[in-house]
C-alpha cells in the first residue's frame, strides 16, 4: 500500500452481537469496512458484544468481546427521552475495552449510534472518530452531535448529505458512502419472480405498505429481516389475507442475495430518513429493480 499501515480499533454496535442481524445496516457497513481496511494492510482490532462473529476473510483481525445488558435502541425511544444506560450495560463495557486498546492505536472508530462514545470524544486520550449511522431521532443525540461538531467536526462522518442535514453542524459534513463488494452478489435477471421486501421488522420500515401492495395484486411477498417488533409483525400479517407474507428471517449476505435475486422487484417502504439504503444497493447488485418512495 502507498501509505504506512495504521493500527485501528473498530467498535461495533451494542445492539446485539455482530452476526445476529439486530444491528441492522450497521452490521453490513462494519463488515464491509473490516474487509476493505484489512485488504489495504491496516492492523484491525474489533471490539464487539459477546457472541459476535468476525468475517473469516480478514487475516490478522483481533476480536475482543464484552458482555452485559443490551443497550436500548434510540430509534424506538421517545424523541424527548433521556439518555439511558442499563445496569451492567454492554455499552460502557465495550468502551472500557475500546479506550484501553485504543491507547496505542492510531484511531478508534465508533459505529454505534449512541450518546456515550460521542460524549467521551473530547475527554479521551485516544483519537475517537464516529460514522454516524442514523438521522435525527432524539433531542439528546442531536445535542451531543452538535456539541461534538462545535468541538471538532472532523471526528464525525455521515452516510449521505440528506442524513447529515438533520443535524446542526458547523461546516460541510464529511460523507462516507457505503461500499459493496459486488463479487459477493450474483446477477440474476428474473422477469416473473415474486415480490420481495427486506429490512428490520419494525414500524419505521413500513412493511405494511409493501404487504398492502402484495395483497392488492393477489401475490405473496417474500420478507427478509429480523423481527424486532413482534406485535408490529403480527398486526401487519393480520391486515392482509393469509399467506400474503412469506417470512424468511434474517439471512447473511450470501444467502440473502441468492433468494433476493429470484425476485422481479424489491419494494422499499421506509417511513423515516434512511441514512443509507443498503438493501436497495444489494437488490440492484442482484439485478432486481427497486420500487421505492
Task: Describe these PLM feature segments.
Residues 1-293:
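Catalytic cores of nucleotide-sugar-dependent glycosyltransferases that transfer UDP/GDP/TDP-activated
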Amino acid at each position: 500500500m502507498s501509505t504506512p499501515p495504521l493500527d485501528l480499533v473498530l467498535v461495533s454496535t451494542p445492539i446485539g452481537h455482530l452476526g445476529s442481524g439486530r444491528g441492522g445496516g450497521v452490521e453490513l457497513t462494519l463488515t464491509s469496512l473490516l474487509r476493505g481496511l484489512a485488504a489495504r494492510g491496516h492492523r484491525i482490532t474489533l471490539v464487539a458484544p459477546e457472541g459476535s462473529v468476525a468475517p473469516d476473510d480478514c487475516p490478522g483481525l483481533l476480536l475482543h468481546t464484552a458482555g452485559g445488558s443490551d443497550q436500548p435502541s434510540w430509534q424506538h425511544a421517545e424523541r424527548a427521552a433521556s439518555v439511558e444506560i442499563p445496569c451492567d450495560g454492554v455499552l460502557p463495557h465495550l468502551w472500557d475495552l475500546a479506550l484501553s486498546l485504543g491507547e496505542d492505536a492510531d484511531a478508534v472508530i465508533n459505529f454505534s449510534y449512541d450518546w456515550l462514545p460521542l460524549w467521551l470524544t473530547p475527554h479521551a486520550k485516544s483519537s475517537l472518530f464516529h460514522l454516524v449511522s442514523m438521522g435525527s431521532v432524539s433531542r439528546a443525540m442531536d445535542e451531543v452531535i452538535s456539541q461534538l461538531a462545535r468541538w471538532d467536526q472532523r471526528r464525525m462522518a455521515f452516510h449521505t448529505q440528506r442524513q447529515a442535514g438533520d443535524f446542526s453542524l458547523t461546516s460541510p459534513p464529511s460523507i462516507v458512502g457505503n461500499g459493496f463488494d459486488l463479487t459477493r452478489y450474483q446477477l440474476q435477471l428474473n422477469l416473473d419472480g415474486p415480490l420481495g421486501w427486506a429490512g428490520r421488522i419494525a414500524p419505521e420500515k413500513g412493511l405494511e405498505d409493501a404487504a398492502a401492495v402484495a395483497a392488492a395484486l393477489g401475490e405473496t411477498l417474500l420478507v427478509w429481516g429480523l423481527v424486532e417488533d413482534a406485535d408490529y409483525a403480527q398486526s401487519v400479517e393480520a391486515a392482509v389475507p393469509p399467506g400474503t407474507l412469506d417470512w424468511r428471517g434474517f439471512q447473511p449476505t450470501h444467502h440473502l442475495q441468492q433468494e433476493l435475486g429470484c425476485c422481479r422487484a424489491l419494494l422499499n417502504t421506509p417511513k423515516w430518513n434512511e441514512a443509507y439504503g443498503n438493501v436497495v444497493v444489494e437488490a440492484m447488485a442482484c439485478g432486481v429493480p427497486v420500487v421505492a418512495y
